[in-house]
Amino acid sequence: MAKIFLSAGEASGEHYGALLMAEISRLAPQTEFFGLGGTRMAAAGLRRVVRAEDVAVMGITEVILHMPHVYREYRKLKASLRTERPDLAILIDFPDVNLSLAAELRRLQIPVVYFVSPQLWAWKKWRVRGVKRNVSRMLVIFPFEEAFYRAHGVAADFVGHPLADLDPPTVTREAFASENGLDASKFWVGLLPGSRARELHANLPPMLETARLLGPEYEYLLPVAPTLKDPQVQALAVQAKGAGVRVVHDARAVLQHARASVVASGTATVEAALIGNPFLVVYRVSRITYAVAQRVVRVAHIGMVNLIAGRRIVPELVQHDFTASKVVERLRPLLENEQARATMQSDLRTVGAALRVNSEGAIQHAARIALQLIPAEQSPRLQSALVSSWPVE
């Protein structure tokens, strides 16, 4: 029986971690999992040494305030590795913790798979040296990342993006309208400011002003996860309702049925591209964070869709350029000009195709590669089963 250590400290990574555990369990029944994760991974069978919610802090101030506690939890993880000696470690995103764990795992001579690369290609390229030294295999979800890591001598494989494996939302426009009290005769505009309180505070006000400027001929939809209980988030939702914006609970359905959307930089931009919803990317952070980013970030675009395409196929409004008037200026063609819409949708289909490797799926692909790194002497029957079940291209 194989024993695998996993570490995922953020919501998206934890979601991928739970899916990965399910696929590994299918391929290698009775595999034992332990490590760092959230409630989804616990439900999938992870024996939690550290809870993700106890170490997930954001922003420079929060990191400084919580440093002693985070360090204590990190020491727990290191101690568990020395005691349990897993056959394999799978680290998922969360670079502030996982890159340090990778160094400890190398010292213990435990194979390390890193799934979902930290964005070292955008900044902190110097940290690639540590990845080369400490990570056995980097499994990336964006196509350009494979070439970046291989150029730096890192064994890397593009496995596809997990979101590309999802089926389109099944809810019809009529059903979604009925469920949420929407006017189905109007075009809908999606407003996706991000899911964290900090992102909503930065991005929602200009989005609400955008709705005011565009006027009542459109219906404006703000998806907010029903599980978000943060009082600040709830207050912002109330503010949105007061501005005539409808608060709903299904972001993917919004992207499926909106005429066009305004989307904060992040995972939602990839979802919009895969669904084929015309959109523009917005991004706003604190002045200090932006000043630092200007000095260290070395990429031509902030939108992942544009990075994948290698050119700007989706408009970007960053920091001071992110104003309601400029959003309206960029959004109107996507609402009113059929040629502009068709051109963007064609470009988005090309990006979507680039996020898929084969029919197997990203999670399945990642699980098979990861299990191959378990030394054969540890589980010879597992290795034999993997070889016989590997898909023929």
What are these regions (language model features)?
Residues 1-393:
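Nucleotide-activated sugar donor-binding and catalytic core shared by glycosyltransferases
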